Amino acid sequence: ETTAIADAMDHIRASLAEMAGRVDTVAGDAASIHDRSSELSAEIDLAASGLAEFKGRLDGARQRLQDLLNAGERLVVLTAEAGIETPETPFVALVREQARDIAQLLERELARGTLSADDLFDETYRPVPGTDPVQFTTRFTEAAERLLPPILDRIKAGNPRIAFCAPLDRNGYVPAHNAEFSRPQGRDPAWNAAHCRNRRRFDDPVAVKAAAGTAPFTVQSYRRDMGGGRQILMLDVSAPIVVGGRHWGALRLGYV
């Protein structure tokens, strides 16, 4: 019996020793993990610092580029106002002339009674069910689609540098567009966004500035995504459409 007790005690001591060894191993592993975690944390902090510095430089470069574009826009405006001929002069003259022609066309429709002022200036935008991106109609949409596309397509076809020509009201609503960008919507929202740009509302900075502009013309520039990671610099010149003394919106002309 005494021998059995001694054997049991030896077994217990051996088990405790084994457990102590395992605890030491776990503790060592934990310490190693802690040390490695500290190293990784330091590396992450260093990487984050580098990324922050890179982001700061990238933001600075973007701002300098935007400042350069803004300076270019102001230069175009100043030269046009001074009557100096530049490569942009024909586009400025074209959009101003066509904006006046569209305004006169709408005034004739009002005089004939085929269009009412309430319909022309309707700003109740009714979503078209099932469209993505969402399209809208107003009481002016039907008349716009009847009257304006032939003018818009003629303008676009007149110069290979012109990418689009479209009117937009004071809230960025485009009731009609070039035929190329007025296709029936399909199931792919990305395709729709590129090819179904009529009956849409646009609130990007360029559209907002063009829509609200009351100066004789507005010149802007921006980078247009052409897909596949390729971008091109687009110039956007617009002129206000004023009907019966009321500012309806603007005619936009985008070109490269």
Where are these regions (language model features)?
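Hydrophobic interface positions of alpha-helical coiled-coils
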Residues: 2, 9, 16, 23, ...
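Surface-exposed helix-capping loop/turn segments at secondary-structure junctions
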Residues: 5, 19, 26, 108-109, ...
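Secondary-structure boundary/capping motif
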Residues: 12-13, 41, 252
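N-terminal membrane-sensor/transducer module of prokaryotic signaling receptors
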Residues: 63-256
